[in-house]
């Protein structure tokens, strides 16, 4: 069991009831525990709207560092330097799978792989926060670090530029909220929830946020506009209007096939931009493409947790999934994910929640020949803008 996980009943019993006020309450009010067990261990003066009422930040995901040679991949280094020059962000949100493979997640090697990434943030005086993906800590044993140990290295290397948003009581590591305030104010004007979506479920497939994480969100969210960041996308993305059924493929390949038992089954159609991508639904899979109005690229099927995992007691709160909770509370304006390396779409679903995916920031694993990130501009009126930023050989920048 994760040492950061507490009993759900104990957590809920210890949580304080929020007063009916807008915004998030202060860290000290959220939990009846010592200050060391709350959140917000960072310089809030660095995370503020500027004089124009704007706050700019980047989402960086799936870097998949695999070299211990003390330098970043060329494409990642250039991607960050060009993005820093163009957007001048105050913050980078790292949404998991920053390292991978036995080599770079092993003790001694992890530090060598990570430090060049942190160093480029410090060089440009950009703050950063981190949560984890399925690959960061998939190896276990005395030769590999836990998520918590990795988090501590981010904190150690980042120093004053590390935004320690973590709430230690919650399942996983790298869970919490980064508050963005107006200059001269201590009241958050916009919140960034950065959460650990786990790695792999016990019953197969990917994991999802747990009951205590959802309960905590409902307790602290208030009505302040917010964005949500985690590594693994929620399955609701497939069924809430962002995708439409792909045109039916006809001809010989579409004919019904017979199994060895003589049963009729639908043929497996190859996924692609013409045939669609096989999205998981509660009743099976459907070949789908981006709906009209959804911007960006869909280049692979989404990889959320299984519905049976996502809806079970360990991953719901009072019968509500994470998405149900967002709809109930009403403050989440958008939710952004990594995990699916070549997807970079962005669109509003039928319930008014904006969903986006951000592609891999390196060529270390499968990719489409571009390395990318996502740039955000928050506005003091509770709105925001976002766009993707890419580099590709010969590394000329492009954005859309």
Sequence positions of predicted segments:
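Active-site neighborhood of phospho(di)ester-bond hydrolases with catalytic His/Asp-centered motifs
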Residues: 59-61, 92-96, 128-134, 228-230, ...
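His/acidic metal-ligating clusters that form di-metal
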Residues: 191-194, 205-344
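Active-site environment of divalent metal-dependent phosphoester hydrolases
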Residues: 66-69, 100-103, 130-142, 200-203, ...
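Binuclear metal-dependent phosphoesterase catalytic core
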Residues: 31-47, 51, 179-181, 306-309, ...
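N-terminal secretory signal peptides and thylakoid transit peptides that target proteins
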Residues: 2-18
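N-terminal active-site segment of His-dependent metallophosphoesterases
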Residues: 28-111, 116
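Extended active-site neighborhood of metal-dependent phosphoesterases/phosphodiesterases
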Residues: 31-49, 112-225, 245-262, 266-268, ...
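Active-site-proximal beta-strand elements of phosphoester/diester hydrolases
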Residues: 54-67, 189-199, 229, 354-360
